[in-house]
Swiss-Prot record:
Polar residues composition-biased segments: 635-649
Ranges annotated as biased composition (Basic and acidic residues): 597-613
Protein name: Capsid protein
Keywords tagged on the record: Capsid protein, T=1 icosahedral capsid protein, Virion
InterPro entries: P2_C_fungal_virus, P2_N_fungal_virus
Species per Swiss-Prot/TrEMBL record: Penicillium chrysogenum virus (isolate Caston/2003) (PcV)
Length: 982
């Protein structure tokens, strides 16, 4: 053994181990500082921290100077794609997934020389994109100015001096314009004045794009055309419709296309339509929808199957017809945002002003250029989610700033609401400065912040801003004392004022991330987004260990006395009766909870030490058995110097008995302990070879473990994988999220997931459900499936048949009972009255309204049956039955037009005309005197179409006054020549 080497000497140049470690650490610090200075990400973070400015919402300080026009990405969706292509190309694809991760880095020590260590922390924020129900509130928004012809503008200002000019400008028939009554010209002038105010079609286009997004998932849906009013583009019908309130108008440039008419009607009515189940709610444009066209009208009651291509082409056609193509981009972005709504319960959109559609051909077409293209499913999701995140970040920045500055015990919601309602335009402008993505600039008519309430404020405080912070990396200005300011320009201080660091901790806590405070250095820090990642399960393969025989080798010049800690602590004197307790060494957690060995065996050779093999459930190791060394006893104390895991008993058993044992003699020598601490190169190489062999067998162990897990899951829950397969088949079949949940619930209640193991498509699922319904019925089901596809209709039919009392409507009950129906006609559906024309319930209602039910009218028809047929197949209301009964009482003809609406029927007169010729005894008159009411009705009603042949025959028999002759001349060309009856 070599003698110990001593280091000493006053003023000498010799160095010891401490000096070597100090110089090595100095080199490490230099290399670390050099590498950190060259880090590009850190350099960008420092520059961003210095450029960020703040604005105060209460005083508006800092908000000036940001109203100039700036060219920004994202004004159009194509520019949005270019922005992300430059920043992070796969980000849009990643955030379109239901689950994704946003990775951030928190840089510490950025304004001083960094301390050696981990100065940068990484946080991966998980985002599970679930949707929130949103309701659209309408407000009076700005109107788009229109370009009408010069003569129409003059007519609106100065009156109509020349009717021919009006006919030429509008394209109306000159004879009809000339014959239009003078007392009705005021309505035309008022209509032309209203035309000059403009139009507003954004909300209607938004509903169209919402339908398109739903159709992208469902592929094909059946829509019905009906329950609307048709207005022919002519002077009389246009003015008559203008005089009636509560109407909205939509211009149809393709009157022969039923698909185009179905899309236009759906865009005007409330969203969602009956065929959809959506979380978005948009009110209808008006109570009555009027289709204006220059051709024939669409017959009501027809059905048409729509697909995404037909819907998209109809939206573009309507936008070009009404000169509002400049709103397509804005409407598309708003629809995507509503479809992916996650943060807001209400938003504001402008009220639809559609009077322009009543006279579209009279105006000059403009803005006919189409912008943008149809979005794919994933891209529409990404655009909507980016818009939602931008709104969330802007709202939370102001709400959190106000909440943090409010005094404890006081409700800040009143101040937040007052500020957002009165300064929503300024807040929207400043929100667009948070990012280089100008989506907020592209949707100026969408109100978000002014529609928020207290529940929205509370919800924002429970959401982490890290869900949208990744979009504000190039922000130029943010709210003073807001979370963005604290996260970008943050500081961790040693004083009690830790507002910036507390915001970081709170936002990470809201994201379910636990921050390690000891790793965060004090001083300035900033937060930067790194990347977006797909959510995938992180599978950690278990470590398997294999024991191999290894010969221990130590260096010949090894001297354990150089270790100053080997001698151990000095023995301390204790009072009499006080037992000395051994100092407990640190024990790894795995050793404390290790299971006891199941088998022990010893092996020996002549030239190697003895080995003890210990086997447990997951660990097999071999440790050498060292002969017990001579005990070193002291006269004052017998405490051991060190303890080792190589003793004959396990360390777990040794540590558990430390506190109860008496002072024990030293169990091993210092040389043996240090020999095991310092292994030779040969030993290390053998250990490395053993580790590589263990990695080879790692794959087999992992595969066996996965097989056992799958077997266990299959035994415990057979539906583990079947439910996911059924969900995918339903999605491929065109069903939405809510519809898939309804189908899964129906499957659980009936056939079960296990019964659909061999199914490969939605058709197979439907067939299994049909077989189950025909065999056992759906008695346990109390709700119908949503949607209007062929699969849904068939299943709903079986559900209704199994539960007739639960799902039978009053209309179906009327159709089933017919003459035996005895219900209340006042609350019954009008379109089903023809089934119960002779029932006691219908006759009782007629008698209560003083209408004789059994008299013959309109060609030997009973009054009760005739009224039921007209009300069911026409557009009249039940309240019109009394007037209709008086009008047809005593008549021998049935000339009632089926297209006549309730409003048009209300203008009809019930007068009876006198005979034209005196009565004669030579023959019977061909008509009854009450039949003259059809002439009066044809002349006075605002719509409908009467047969000209019958009207001519009636004109020969009755004396028609001049006012009625003029009206019949304009509408039907009667009384036009010398022979007025030809």
């Amino acid at each position: 053994m070599a003698a110990p080497v001593l280091y000493g000497g006053a003023g000498g140049t010799a160095t010891g181990p401490g000096d070597m470690r100090r110089s090595l650490m100095h080199e490490k610090k230099q290399v670390f500082a050099e590498l950190r200075r060259e880090a590009q990400a850190l350099r960008v973070a420092k520059e961003a921290r210095g450029k960020m400015s703040v604005w105060d919402p209460s005083t508006r300080e800092g908000a000036r100077g940001y109203r100039e026009k700036v060219v920004r990405f994202g004004r159009q969706i194509a520019s949005l794609l270019q922005y992300f292509e430059n920043m992070h190309s796969p980000a849009l694809d990643i955030i379109a997934c239901d689950k994704f991760l946003l990775k951030y880095q928190i840089y510490g020590d950025i304004d001083r020389d960094p301390a050696f260590g981990e100065n940068t922390m990484t946080a991966e924020v998980p985002v599970v994109w679930d949707k929130c129900e949103v309701e659209v509130k309408l407000y009076a928004g700005p109107l788009q100015k229109l370009m009408s012809r010069a003569k129409l503008v003059g007519a609106a200002r100065e009156g109509i001096p020349n009717r021919n000019d009006v006919a030429k400008s509008t394209g109306w028939n000159q004879d009809q314009v000339q014959k239009f009554p003078d007392n009705r010209m005021d309505s035309l002038i008022s209509l032309l004045e209203q035309m000059q105010t403009g139009q507003s079609k954004l909300t209607r286009l938004v509903k169209g794009f919402l339908i398109l997004l739903e159709m992208a998932e469902r592929k094909e849906v059946d829509f019905h055309v009906g329950n609307h009013i048709h207005v022919t583009y002519a002077i009389a019908p246009v003015c008559d419709s203008y005089d009636l309130p509560g109407r909205c108008y939509v211009f149809n440039s393709k009157p022969t296309s039923e698909a185009h008419a179905a899309v236009l009607l759906a865009m005007c009515r409330e969203y969602p339509p009956p065929q959809f189940a959506s979380h978005v709610s948009v009110p209808a444009d008006a109570e009555d929808v009027c289709i204006v066209s220059q051709g024939r009208q669409i017959q009501p009651g027809s059905a048409v199957t729509l697909n995404p291509g037909l819907v998209y082409s109809s939206i573009l056609t309507y936008a070009m017809d009404t000169s509002c193509t400049d709103l397509l981009q804005e409407a598309q972005i708003i629809a995507c945002s509503l479809q992916e709504n996650r943060y807001f319960s209400r938003i504001g959109l402008p009220t639809v002003v559609s009077l322009y559609d009543l006279m579209v051909p009279a105006f000059i077409a403009q803005n006919s250029a189409l912008e943008g293209a149809r979005l794919s499913g994933d891209l529409s999701k990404a655009v909507g989610r980016v818009h939602q995140m931008l709104g969330m970040v802007a709202a939370k920045d102001i709400i959190s700033a106000t909440h943090m500055q409010s005094r404890t015990g006081f409700d800040p919601s009143h101040g937040i609401r007052q500020y957002l309602n009165s300064n929503s335009r300024l807040v929207t402008q400043m929100a667009s400065k948070l990012t280089g993505i100008g989506l907020f600039d592209a949707t100026p008519q969408m109100r978000i912040f002014s529609e928020m309430d207290t529940a929205d404020y509370a919800d924002m405080l429970h959401l982490t801003i890290f869900e949208g912070l990744w979009l504000v990396q190039d922000a130029s200005v943010c709210t003073d004392n807001g979370p963005i300011s604290f996260l970008v320009n943050g500081e961790k201080l040693l004083s009690a004022d830790r507002a910036g660091y507390d915001v970081l901790v709170e936002e990470l806590t809201l994201a379910n991330i636990r921050i390690e405070h000891h790793k965060m250095p004090t001083g300035a820090f900033t937060t930067r987004w790194v990347a977006a990642k797909r959510d995938s399960a992180l599978r950690l393969t278990p470590r398997s260990r294999t024991a191999h025989r290894v010969d221990m080798v130590r260096e010949c010049d090894f001297n354990p006395t150089m270790n100053l800690k080997a001698a151990g602590p000095k023995a301390r004197l204790r009072g009499s009766g006080v037992k000395s307790r051994r100092r407990v060494s640190e024990v790894p957690l795995a050793h404390v909870f290790r299971s006891p060995p199941r088998r022990e065996s010893t092996t020996t050779t002549d030239d190697s030490p003895r080995w003890l093999t210990r086997e447990g459930p997951q660990l097999t190791r071999r440790v050498p058995i060292i002969d017990e060394p001579p005990a070193y006893e002291s006269g004052r104390s017998s405490s051991p110097v060190t303890s080792s895991i190589s003793e004959g008993t396990s360390q777990h058993e040794e540590e558990m008995g430390l506190f109860d044992a008496e002072e024990l003699p030293m169990q091993q020598t210092v040389i043996a302990t240090e020999a095991r601490r310092r292994l030779g190169r040969g030993t290390l190489e053998r250990i490395q070879e053993a580790a590589l062999e263990g990695q080879v067998a790692q794959g087999e162990v992992t595969a066996e473990k996965n097989r056992r897990i799958e077997a266990m899951l299959s035994a415990r829950d057979p539906q583990f994988t079947g439910r996911e397969q059924i969900t995918k088949m339903l999605s491929d079949g065109g069903l939405g999220v809510r519809e898939r949940e309804e189908w899964l619930e129906l499957v659980d209640k009936t056939v079960g997931v296990k019964g659909l193991k061999e199914v490969r498509s939605i058709d197979g699922i439907r067939r299994h459900l049909e077989e189950y319904g025909e065999r056992e019925g759906f008695a346990v089901v109390r709700t119908l499936l949503s949607g209007n596809s062929k699969h849904v209709r068939r299943i709903n039919q079986l559900i209704r048949e199994s539960n007739p009392s639960a799902f039978e409507t009053e209309a179906s009950r009327m159709r089933r009972l017919r003459a035996d129906w005895d219900g209340d006609a006042g609350s019954a559906p009008v379109n089903a009255l023809h089934f119960v024309g002779n029932s006691p319930g219908w006759k009782r209602w007629l008698e209560n309204n003083n209408i004789p039910s059994d008299i013959q009218v309109a060609g030997k028809k009973r009054m009760c049956s005739y009224l039921a047929e007209v009300l069911s197949h026409g557009n009249l209301k039940l309240s019109d039955a009394t007037k209709l009964g008086r009008l047809v009482e005593g008549t021998s003809l049935d000339l009632f037009p089926p297209q006549l609406s309730s409003e048009e029927f209300s203008t009809c007169s019930e007068a009876t005309l006198a005979w034209r010729n005196a009565p004669s005894s030579l023959g019977v008159r061909p008509f009854a005197q009450e039949d003259s009411r059809w002439l009066v009705m044809a002349a006075t009603c605002g719509g409908g179409s009467f047969g000209i042949g019958k009207l001519k025959s009636l004109c020969k028999e009755f004396s028609v006054p001049k006012e009625l002759r003029d009206a019949l001349r304009v509408k039907y060309g009667l009384f036009g020549g010398k022979d007025s009856l030809e």
